[in-house]
């Protein structure tokens, strides 16, 4: 595939992939060329990379077996993914909250002229209230200690761990492969678990039973600390998907809004009460 990034970061990624591969996690590691480089060039000087690939199918979000197998794979992945630093995300939440207010002001000043804008104005106060509550929860947790520990241990996240990047290997009943590590970063590792669970649970209308199964499967392999448990609650409390839709609208010149994004916003509004209840119920009791 074409490559446009930093070769230095790519070497770090390869180091990570090979460590995982050597410890029994199938990855799409890079293949070196005759010059022992990970990046090659064609006649037009276009840079590209070659990666090991697998015969298999993506994680089926309709299959609980695939979902739970993916969670177990993520737990094993996190045990092995250690390198070095993390970024503060409290400031990110505060910035996102300010952006939600800015978009609200922009639409009010110009007048809501389409379905997306009308839905946004009708719902933004409730989602903003939830966003501010998430910041308050974060301030009440041991987030600084959690960040310091993640920094000290060099915890690494996949960055885009979702159903498209977990393959169920053909002919291997137990095997999985994890692909597309291009967004790896230093972070608190339950960020990966949050992202995977959120994408699945949106499809299951925030089903508490399924969420409990996913958390238990992960916890059995890589125990979730009490601080990480609180951090997961904060992440599920913050309306990240709502902010993403609003930010996409605002940063793309507000000229045309796709039907798909209107549907996504309407679905978030419909699910709001179930989603709010989910964060309270799911993380009420720390697993024993």
Where is each model-derived feature located?
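Helix N-cap / loop-to-helix initiation motif
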Residues: 26, 224-228
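Active-site acidic catalytic loop and adjacent metal/ATP-binding pocket
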Residues: 30, 136-190
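ATP/Mg2+ or Mg2+-diphosphate-binding catalytic cores
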Residues: 242-288
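Active-site activation/catalytic loop segments of kinase-like enzymes and analogous catalytic loops
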Residues: 190-223, 236-255
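ATP-dependent phospho-/nucleotidyl transfer catalytic cores
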Residues: 7-8, 87-157, 213
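A glycine-centered beta->alpha junction motif in the catalytic cores
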Residues: 48-61, 102-113, 196, 238-257
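ATP-binding pocket architecture of kinase catalytic cores
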Residues: 1-86
């Amino acid at each position: 595939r074409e490559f446009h990034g930093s070769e230095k970061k790519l070497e770090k990624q390869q180091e990570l992939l090979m460590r995982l591969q050597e410890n029994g996690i199938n990855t799409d590691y890079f293949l070196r060329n005759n010059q022992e480089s990970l990046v090659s060039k064609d006649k037009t000087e276009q840079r590209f990379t070659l990666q090991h690939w697998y015969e298999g199918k993506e994680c089926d979000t309709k299959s609980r077996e695939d979902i739970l197998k993916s969670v177990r794979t993520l737990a094993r992945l996190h045990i092995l993914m250690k390198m070095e630093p993390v970024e503060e995300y409290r400031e990110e939440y505060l910035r996102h909250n300010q952006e939600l207010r800015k978009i609200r002001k922009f639409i009010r000043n110009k007048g809501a002229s389409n379905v997306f804008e009308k839905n946004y104005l009708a719902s933004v106060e409730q989602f903003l209230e939830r966003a501010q509550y998430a910041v308050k929860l974060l301030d009440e947790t041991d987030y600084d200690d959690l960040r310091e520990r993640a920094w000290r241990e060099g915890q690494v996240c996949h960055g885009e761990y979702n159903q498209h990047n977990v393959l169920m290997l053909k002919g291997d009943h137990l095997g999985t492969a994890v692909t597309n590590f291009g967004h790896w970063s230093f972070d608190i590792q339950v960020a990966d678990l949050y992202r995977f669970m959120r994408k699945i649970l949106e499809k299951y209308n925030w089903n508490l039973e399924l969420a409990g199964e996913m958390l238990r499967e992960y916890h059995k392999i890589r125990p979730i600390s009490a601080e990480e448990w609180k951090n997961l609650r904060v992440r599920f409390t913050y309306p990240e998907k709502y902010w993403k839709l609003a930010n996409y609208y605002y940063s793309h010149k507000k000229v045309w809004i796709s039907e798909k994004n209107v549907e996504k916003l309407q679905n978030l509004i419909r699910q709001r009460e179930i989603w709010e209840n989910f964060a309270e119920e799911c993380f009420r009791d720390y697993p024993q």
